Amino acid sequence: MSREVHVRFCERLEVKSLRPTHPYVAAAQGFVYVAFVIDTFARRIVGWRVSRSAQADFVLDALEQALCDRRPVRQGGLVHHSDRGVQYVSIRYTQRLLEAGIEPSVGSVGDSYDNALAETINGLFKAEVIRRRPWRSAEAVELATLEWVDWFNHRRLLEPIGNIPPAEAEARYYAHQNELAMVA
């Protein structure tokens, strides 16, 4: 499950809903679900959660982590895009977005382009982590996800952002903003 959060950059927050194509893992102890919140500008994963339940709570936890990490300063202009998954159209989720000053936006039915970045992250996660071995527990998936998110953010080179890692793309953005502020 990919959540794409952008708070300070292009002012766009995208979220992907839970569907059978989202990262879920068959572990020895049952299914495990994974949620990601991704900055759409730098493609940095800024929130994530692993859960044994597909209830809205774990999706809210991933969103809260992203909001805590990003601390959006602008009210208005930030859009949270999601598909029509039950978690994202729930009253609690929508209410939390509005409390944070984020405009909810729901994608059209069956339009894979609405969630292309989320699907890309899901595919990478499945190929690079989930399909590589059998999983015994949610805890094992959580530890592997933690390690992968750190690697993805700080070492994975992404062509759409100049063949640099997401954390470096952010650092360059802020350095450029600081240079502009000094010149002004």
What feature does the model see in each segment?
Residues 21-184:
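Charged DNA-binding/catalytic regions of mobile-element recombinases
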